[in-house]
Design a protein with these regions (language model features):
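Acidic/histidine-rich alpha-helical segments that form the ligand environment
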Residues: 15-18, 83-120, 141
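A generic structural signal for well-ordered alpha-helical segments enriched in polar/charged residues
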Residues: 20, 24, 28, 65, ...
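Acidic/His metal-coordination segments adjacent to aromatic residues that form catalytic metal sites
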Residues: 3-6, 42-45, 82-96, 128-137
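A glycine-rich, hydrophobic loop/mini-helix early in the fold
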Residues: 28-29, 39
């Protein structure tokens, strides 16, 4: 996995921007269109948001553990498996986006208090091949970069579904 090497300030900016951008992209889109996939086998905007939320849960918990414990060992969890333990795929887009926005506000409040050394707190991640040492900054970068791709995907999905309706 390749994660862009972003400074903490850029991570914070991107993490704050994504919920706002999602709200802007979907503000005038009917609920039915947010549930529609652009073509068979592709995700609807709602499914992409559910995936974004699943990633935010999984990787956000890793960040929380690294801040609460000294060098914890964390078992890797796949957001694609974790999503099955949630109701995210069953939720309507707008309430799901509100919940995501609230969760993001809470994460940003925690991250805003970090001093530079705290961004470098570590965990050993096991269960997905070779054990890896990851930092709070790494998970922030991963989350920001991964979401950036999926926010763009939602924008493309909304445009594609709009054209077919």
């Amino acid at each position: 996995m390749t994660v862009r090497d972003l400074p903490a300030d850029d991570v914070m900016e991107l993490l704050a921007e994504h919920p706002r951008r999602l709200a802007s992209i979907t503000a005038r889109v009917p609920a039915a269109q947010l549930l529609a996939a652009p073509s068979p086998g592709e995700w609807s905007a709602n499914e992409v948001l559910a995936h974004i939320r699943s990633c935010a849960d999984v990787w956000g918990r890793c960040i929380a553990r690294m801040l609460a414990e000294d060098d914890p060992t964390i078992r890797a969890v796949s957001p694609r498996s974790y999503i099955d333990k949630t109701d995210y795929l069953d939720l309507q887009f707008k309430p799901s986006l509100r919940a995501f926005t609230q969760q993001r506000t809470e994460l940003l409040a925690v991250l805003a208090e970090l001093r530079p050394p705290e961004w470098m707190r570590t965990a050993t991640v096991t269960g997905a091949g070779k054990a890896l040492v990851r930092t709070v900054l790494f998970y922030g970068q991963w989350l920001a970069d991964h979401e950036r791709i999926h926010v763009g995907q939602i924008e493309q999905t909304v445009a594609a579904v709009r054209l077919t309706r």
